Amino acid sequence: MIDYEKRRINKALTMFSQLFAGLAVGLGFGFVMSIVSNGFVISVRWLTDLREVRIAYLLGLDQQIAALLPLFCLFFAAFLILQVRRVFGIDRWHGPADSIYAAHRTDNELDTRKGFGSTLAALISAGGGASVGQYGPLVHFGATMGSLVRTWTRGFVTTDVFIGCGVAGAIAAGFNAPIAGVVFAHEAILRHFSMRAIAPIAIASISSSWFSQQLFGNNPLLDFTSIVPDLSVVLPAALLFGPVFGFVAVVFMIAIRKSLQFAGACDWAPSRLIFLAALITGTFGIFVPEVLGLGSGPLRVILDGGYSDSYLLLILVGKLLLTALCIGFGLFGGVFSPALFVGAAAGAFVGRISATVVGIAAGPALAICGMAAVASAVIGAPIAGVMIVLEMTMNYQMALAAMLSVVTASIISHLLYGHSFFDRQLLDRGIDVAQGRGHIEMMETPVLDIVSDDFVGIGEAEVQAQALEKLVSANHSEAYLLSDHGVLLGKLNLQTLLSNEAKQDLFTIADQAPLSIKHDASLQQAIEVASDFVGESIPVVDRATGIMQGVVNEADLFKLYLKLQSRVTDLERS
């Protein structure tokens, strides 16, 4: 009876401690991310206003010189970004792909120095006029904060919960969309649902939105609450043009990927690449300023039906290509805001074509459908994309129409490109998160962790009688023929030794090409090798030198596999 009461008390204490931890973590991240997200947005707006208006006014520049300001500002931004690379020791920029990867590892911590440096670089890029976004860097900042706090607190809550709180808080504050923040964190980053994670993540998202409204006011990006679209017209158009938006998303992602690949393959210095991007973007921006920066102002104009058809097509193509150029060549930033812009421009353009050709006048609804469809396909989060539209517009009919475009566009982009832009980034690094946490854990667990020295080694000068004696003494049925330097020469088994003449050379009767595992193999690779194996043990060999490191057996492999699977299950289902 006493033990039963103790268990009840311990269970109650555990429940209250988890509740308190979830509340504290959620509120803490909500407050921090509301400050950081709004601070980032306000800073970019201030820098944009400085670039577009204040510098020319304060310096009294004439019109010809002021027209060149986009070019000068981008050159200055490129210079500052190079300094950020040097100070923070950044060899490559970090973003949401790294957040996804970190959330799929049970023992991984994000590089906080490079994470914060990447966010600062994105702020400089967007403020300087580069055609990049803000939400990706904010998402990664939230994930980096989560990883850092987890280290400080010594892991009283798992890393994925901290990362989820940071990500949800960033989205909720950035879009004033707390529900979308919760959905995005689970759908795009964590990719699993557990009762342990949902409470702190929801608290972080809702509190981040609340703190943002209380401290910075309610400034929705879009306001279509007064517009009620005709669903009988909009829904068929949304369904019809969904694949078109999916194709636009694929072209957008391919352009960025090819730009990154070109920059990585060429032998140009980072400074040359980034200044070239600044030159091209700034020159184009002198004549088409709508493609510079985050594009929030032009986005509103597009959704309100502004710009001529030809100019709309120009800024659509220009934004797509310049975003690829900037991100690929070092003017780092996010892809989500440009995807919103490209999608809205594509939706508005096809909406006008449909109105002219087939008489389907969908108004701003098709532009919103395109915006949601392209952005959702790029980030690989269709449900979160629909929720963002719903919470930004507060219009159920538009969200319903957007859902049709989102799901059809996502199917097309998934078939032609992949799950998301971030998944493809990870695949290019040899990481397939679609296989799940278990696969990643097995790929990152070295087989050397379970290598044993419990094997019988036979010297190349020894004879058959000595080999038999060693096998019997060690109670083994297999032995390994080794050189004086430990190089594996072959594998012997008891049956072969007994069935051959005693005077026969051991090397001639040994299996000279036995099944082996390379010393730097992962658990996943070792299991794949062992699937075709029948015997006592498998040698682990350094392929460069031929030296035998030890052996593994099937029992050890599967014990480690089950241990990893149990840990992943606890993480995803608890």
Protein language model features and the residues they cover:
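Nucleotide-binding motor/catalytic cores of P-loop/tubulin-like NTPases across gene-expression machines
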Residues: 491-494, 498, 503-506, 523
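Alpha-helical transmembrane segments and immediately membrane-proximal extracytoplasmic
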Residues: 1-444, 449, 453-454, 458-489, ...
